């Protein structure tokens, strides 16, 4: 959140909505000015629930008219650099007139989060089920990749064992 929030302060086109299944995170976000957060207890059933909760929260905030693109990022990528996210956002803004639909970070053959979708793909994202994420939608389109040099930035640490493995890299 802090990395994205720093980007938001430099770029008025960015608005951040946090989706969490943890009440503690929701409470924490409510103590921060301009931190939009939504509780999604169903997220434990799969990533599709998190995606839907985020989209619906943005739509409920009546921001849909302003949103051309939706970026989905996970909170457990400790090595993700702000510069990489800036490169991704710059690529989206640079391609805005070309109507590209999907943007993602990549290191070699490894593709990862964050991923950005044009608002025209929202119906497809809302139709996702279970643990199917946005990548299943992204694969249907000519994705614009932003190449990064360090694959560790794409590392997603979901468990304590992943964390221990990552530390030894």
Protein language model annotation of sequence segments:
Residues 25-29, 88, 125, 166:
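Hydrophobic packing residues within well-ordered alpha-helices of enzyme cores
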Residues 123, 127-169:
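Conserved alpha/beta core of the MobA/IspD/sugar-nucleotide pyrophosphorylase nucleotidyltransferase superfamily
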Residues 38-45, 77, 151-154:
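Glycine-rich "substrate-gating" loop/helix at the edge of Rossmann-like oxidoreductase active sites
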Residues 26, 48-51, 85, 122, ...:
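A general structural signal for well-ordered alpha-helical segments in protein cores
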Residues 44-119, 123:
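Conserved beta-loop-beta/alpha segment of the NTase-like Rossmann-fold superfamily
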Residues 15, 36, 101, 142-144, ...:
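Conserved beta-strand segments of alpha/beta enzyme cores
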Residues 1-68, 83:
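Conserved N-terminal catalytic core of the sugar/cofactor nucleotidyltransferase
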């Amino acid at each position: 959140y802090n990395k994205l929030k720093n980007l938001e302060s430099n770029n008025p086109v960015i608005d951040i909505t946090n989706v969490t299944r943890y009440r503690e995170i929701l409470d924490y976000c409510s103590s921060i000015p301009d931190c939009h957060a939504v509780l999604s207890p169903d997220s434990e059933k799969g990533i599709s629930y998190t995606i839907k909760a985020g989209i619906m929260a943005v739509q409920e905030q009546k921001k849909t008219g302003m949103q051309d693109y939706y970026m989905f990022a996970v909170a457990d990528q400790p090595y993700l650099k702000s510069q990489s996210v800036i490169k991704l956002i710059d690529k989206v803004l640079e391609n805005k007139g070309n109507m590209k639909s999907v943007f993602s970070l990549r290191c070699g053959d490894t593709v990862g989060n964050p991923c950005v979708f044009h608002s025209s793909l929202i119906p497809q994202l809302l139709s996702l089920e279970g643990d199917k994420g946005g990548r299943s939608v992204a694969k249907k389109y000519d994705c614009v990749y932003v190449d990064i040099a360090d694959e560790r930035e794409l590392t997603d640490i979901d468990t304590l064992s992943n964390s221990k493995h990552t530390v030894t890299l």
